[in-house]
């Protein structure tokens, strides 16, 4: 997706995550809960990647500066098994919104009924037309030397009503895509759900606000495993549940567009302080059910993997103070921890339980057991970082959004007046590669060093950016990606178990609330020339980067059991 963080610039709004590794301050509440929230330690016998040590990049100033030649990452910095690829999602690229038996999704409904909620009034009816042009997408991946394509399944394309009758034409489409990828030596990584719930289920019982969604999602996942599992070995159950819950049920700026009465959203009939947690709870329960089913019945290869893809944001304390250190810890808990802690340890972070109270649903013991250690792999979608600033916890402060519950504001500028990094063409993305390195080390040190894929990472070309007049000369994206690939290598050198980097996105597509005015693709879509795919400068760089023969690359080095 590319996280459209429309609210990250609001100082009282807190969207996403992370922080500096290596700082010893702990969350005040977590100290008292540490003994009861130890990981069950599923992640063991992991590997640390070997390769030529990378050259550290110079500090980034307030503007984009190109790396020195010796700082540009090389493929042989990474071992032969490290995977480079690109990601997309169904609604953003496929088009064909009502063709061949497909049913409407919540995003079809949202864009058609509330076009004013999209900045340019557009929709995904045609998008990049990948339903018809998927072979061109595969060709672009092959031309770049990419080894992985991460894409999502449209629930309403294969189950038009969300349940019941299967649409064989939808199954056939994904079979053709998967077979084409494999024939070109590209590995499919499948996201089962990427925000586009069938509208039929939204109309029937409110979608993810109702517990019925858990079983319906399980049946959808079962159909995916049965239809594609003979060729697909790597699965993500959900993509970016944190952003989905905050934007769809808190602020209401994404489908289905719900928020509290009196707020400015498409459907001001919800509860912005409760519904995000209700929807998130059902997502976690659906994940647990799907994973248990997969491990019991559908691990057809014996070594197939399943996990979840989390949206993440790096965090630094606003200033060097105890209170801002604690704010940073709460920021981590309320964003990364909200969905990560349950799938690792079986419950929400203690700080969330302390501050949210009865608005946060409770797991049964059986649910906790199913959730704990329910990810074989984890995806992290990283774009940017923020400073975290303490907000006084007081009975006089009444949260209006669930994102206020952390009592930590998200700032782009620190106490010294400097931005956290140079702003990109996209107003919410400030380039801060260190945030990615730090986040990966947090995963290593706090969460048992799970196998991680960077499942999204990139920036957008935007309308009106005079520094990039040529749509194919995306020099900012190239610099951004080079620095973040180097940041991944820095984390690997310090022991983080990172297995791959997937750029967001493969092609220019429909970017949710920004429509087509914000374009994240490595590949340009020329809509005036039959939606022809044209490689941008960054894509051509990947073609050279990935051209190193595999036999010249190193191999992994096994380590002992990961820390827990």
From Swiss-Prot:
Expressed in young seedlings early after germination. It is found in: Plastid, Chloroplast. Keywords: Chloroplast, Disulfide bond, Glycosidase, Hydrolase, Plastid, Transit peptide. GO terms for cellular component: chloroplast. Optimum pH is 5.5. Its EC number is 3.2.1.182, 3.2.1.21. Residues 1-50 form a transit peptide. It catalyses: Hydrolysis of terminal, non-reducing beta-D-glucosyl residues with release of beta-D-glucose; DIMBOA beta-D-glucoside + H2O = DIMBOA + D-glucose; DIBOA beta-D-glucoside + H2O = DIBOA + D-glucose. Disulfide bonds join 259-265. The active site is at residues 240, 456. GO terms for molecular function: beta-glucosidase activity; DIMBOA glucoside beta-D-glucosidase activity. The keyword Transit peptide applies. It comes from the Eukaryota. SUPFAM superfamilies: (Trans)glycosidases. A beta-D-glucoside binds at residues 92, 194, 239-240, 383, 456, 504, 511-512, 520. GO terms for biological process: carbohydrate metabolic process. Acts in defense of young plant parts against pests via the production of hydroxamic acids from hydroxamic acid glucosides. Enzymatic activity is highly correlated with plant growth. The preferred substrate is DIMBOA-beta-D-glucoside. Belongs to the glycosyl hydrolase 1 family. Wheat is a hexaploid with three different genomes that contains at least four genes coding for GLU1: GLU1A (AC Q1XIR9), GLU1B (AC Q1XH05), GLU1C (AC Q1XH04) and GLU1D (AC D5MTF8). The monomers can aggregate in diverse combinations, reflecting the several isozymes found in the native enzyme described in PubMed:10750901. Homo- and heterohexamers. This is 4-hydroxy-7-methoxy-3-oxo-3,4-dihydro-2H-1,4-benzoxazin-2-yl glucoside beta-D-glucosidase 1d, chloroplastic. It comes from Triticum aestivum. The lineage of its organism: Eukaryota, Viridiplantae, Streptophyta, Embryophyta, Tracheophyta. The gene is GLU1D.
């Amino acid at each position: 997706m590319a996280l459209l963080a429309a609210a990250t610039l609001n100082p009282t709004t807190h969207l996403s995550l992370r922080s500096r590794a290596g700082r010893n301050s702990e969350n005040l509440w977590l100290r008292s809960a540490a003994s009861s929230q130890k990981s069950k330690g599923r992640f063991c016998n992991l590997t640390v990647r070997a390769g030529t040590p990378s050259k550290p990049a110079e500090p980034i100033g307030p503007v984009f500066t190109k790396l020195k030649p010796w700082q540009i990452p090389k493929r042989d910095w990474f071992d032969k098994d490290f995977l480079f690829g690109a990601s997309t999602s169904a609604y953003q690229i496929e088009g064909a919104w009502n063709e061949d038996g497909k049913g409407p999704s919540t995003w079809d409904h949202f864009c058609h009924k509330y076009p004013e909620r999209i900045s340019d009034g557009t929709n995904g009816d045609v998008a990049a037309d990948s339903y018809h042009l998927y072979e061109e997408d595969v060709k672009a991946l092959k031309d770049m030397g990419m080894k992985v394509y991460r894409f999502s399944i449209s629930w309403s394309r294969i189950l038009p009503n969300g349940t019941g009758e299967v649409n064989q034409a939808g199954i056939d489409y994904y079979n053709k895509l998967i077979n084409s990828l494999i024939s070109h030596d590209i590995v499919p990584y499948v996201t089962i759900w990427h925000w586009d719930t069938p509208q039929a289920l939204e109309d029937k019982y409110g979608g993810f606000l109702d517990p019925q969604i858990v079983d319906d999602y399980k049946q959808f996942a079962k159909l995916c495993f049965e239809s594609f599992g003979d060729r697909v070995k790597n699965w993500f159950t959900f993509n970016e549940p944190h952003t989905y819950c905050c934007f769809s049920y808190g602020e209401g700026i994404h489908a289905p567009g719900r928020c509290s009465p009196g707020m400015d959203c498409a459907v001001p009939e919800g509860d912005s302080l409760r519904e995000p947690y209700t929807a998130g709870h059902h997502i976690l329960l659906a994940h647990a059910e799907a994973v248990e089913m997969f491990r019991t019945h559908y691990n057809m290869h014996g070594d197939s993997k399943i996990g979840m893809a989390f949206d993440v944001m790096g965090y630094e304390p606003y200033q060097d103070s105890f209170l801002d250190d604690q704010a940073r810890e709460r920021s981590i808990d309320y964003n990364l921890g909200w969905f990560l802690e349950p799938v690792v340890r079986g419950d929400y972070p203690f700080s969330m339980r302390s501050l949210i109270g009865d608005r946060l649903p409770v797991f049964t013991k059986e649910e906790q057991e199913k959730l704990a250690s329910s990810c074989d792999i984890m995806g992290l979608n990283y774009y940017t970082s923020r400073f975290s600033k303490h907000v006084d916890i007081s009975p006089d402060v009444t949260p209006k959004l669930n994102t206020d519950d952390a009592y930590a504001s998200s700032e782009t500028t620190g106490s010294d007046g400097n931005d956290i990094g140079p702003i990109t063409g996209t107003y919410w993305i400030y380039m801060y590669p260190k945030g990615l390195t730090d986040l990966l080390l947090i995963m290593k040190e706090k969460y048992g060093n799970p196998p991680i894929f960077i499942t999204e990472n990139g920036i957008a070309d935007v309308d009106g950016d005079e520094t990039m007049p040529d749509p194919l000369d995306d020099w900012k994206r190239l610099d951004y990606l080079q620095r973040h690939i180097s940041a991944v290598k820095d984390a690997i050198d310090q022991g983080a178990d990172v297995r791959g980097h997937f750029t967001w996105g493969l092609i220019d597509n429909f970017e949710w609330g920004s429509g087509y005015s914000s374009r994240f693709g490595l590949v340009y879509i020329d809509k005036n020339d039959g939606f022809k795919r044209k490689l941008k400068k960054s894509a051509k760089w990947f073609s050279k980067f990935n051209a190193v023969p595999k036999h010249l690359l190193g191999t992994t080095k096994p380590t002992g059991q990961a820390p827990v």
